[in-house]
Regions:
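Disordered, acidic Ser/Thr/Pro-rich linker "stalks" and the adjacent N-terminal cap
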Residues: 1-51, 64, 159-161, 165-167
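Hydrophobic beta-strand residues in large extracellular and virion-surface proteins
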Residues: 9, 48, 72-74, 99, ...
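Hydrophobic side chains in beta-strands
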Residues: 11, 61, 76, 130, ...
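Short amphipathic alpha-helices and their capping/turn residues within compact interaction modules
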Residues: 29, 51-55, 64, 77-79, ...
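Hydrophobic/aromatic beta-strand segments within beta-rich folds
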Residues: 45-48, 55-62, 110-146
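Short, surface-exposed beta-strand/strand-loop-strand elements in extracellular ectodomains
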Residues: 68-87
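Extracellular carbohydrate recognition and processing domains
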Residues: 86-115
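Edge beta-strands of jelly-roll/beta-sandwich modules across compartments, strongly enriched
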Residues: 135-166
Length: 167
């Protein structure tokens, strides 16, 4: 049975003051989530550090109905060998791939899209690079949000079963 794995947001290239990246560190019904700054320059980046090196197997991305990223690149990072204090800024990242999201015009911005990416990589860090937002009449500030990040692992093997990021 999967269980939640601890993580913290360790890097953010920008944030809306009302929706700081630190909101992702606690997953509660009252969490507001992170959002890119208004009229920001893309790409935007968010970095997550796990409590320990883990075998990441799946990423799920759930888009917001109107504030939609066009493309999100996924990277898994490892600490530099011999580094006594691993840091996101010094990590070696390997590109796992990307997801493209539908602009959602056909549903009149009523639906949310769920994407699942399967991969197998050991890492201490996860980097998500948001390339730009879909321009539409409801996204007046050209933003992309992340509502929550839930990371699960197998309790005994300490492998990720999935990471869910709601964008």
């Amino acid at each position: 049975m999967p269980s939640k794995l601890r993580f913290k947001v360790c890097y953010c290239s920008g944030e809306d003051p009302d929706f700081p990246a630190s909101e992702l560190n606690a997953h509660t019904p009252h969490t507001r989530g992170w959002q890119t700054p208004r009229f920001c320059e893309y790409p935007q980046e968010i970095g997550i550090q796990f409590a320990s090196v883990s075998d990441i197997q799946q990423l799920q991305v759930l888009s917001h109905q109107s504030k939609i990223a066009t493309r999100i690149e996924i990277f898994v990072g490892t600490a530099v060998e011999g580094d006594p204090r691993p840091a996101y800024s010094r990590a070696k990242f390997k590109r796992m791939g990307y997801v493209s999201l539908d602009p959602n015009e056909r549903s009149n911005f009523q639906a949310r899209e769920l994407k699942t990416v399967q991969f197998n990589a050991n890492g201490l860090f996860l980097k998500l690079v948001i390339h730009k937002c879909s321009v539409n009449r409801l996204n007046i500030y050209s933003q992309v949000p992340t509502s929550s990040s839930v990371i699960h692992s197998q309790l005994l093997s300490l492998h990720f079963s999935y990471l869910c990021v709601m964008i």
